[in-house]
Amino acid sequence: MSLLNNIIIKTIPLLPKNMVKIIADQYVAGNTIKDATYKTKQLNLKKYKVTIDLLGEHIKELEQTTDITNIYIELLNQIYSQSLDSNISVKPTHIGLDIGIDVFKTKALKLVEKAK
């Protein structure tokens, strides 16, 4: 990691939250699927391809991994139904890897099947 990246990483916690929000807003589409698809549409009109990511990882509760998997499935439904030039980025620990490999495989296979 470059020296500049290290400085930025160490400085961010010291910044006022409203300043961090101004910087983050360039990269965070919003809090809902509707927000994400709206922003994706805007970027697609400018000829950008988009990767959508749900923030979070290291989930330890099975029910949460199911909820997160279902959100990704709905996100894929919206990407397809709106013909968005987009994909999703999934962190293995967000869909159960920390709980166990079988939980992760089950959730990952659901997403792969939906994405076909």
PLM region spans:
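Alpha/beta catalytic barrel-like cores
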Residues: 1-116
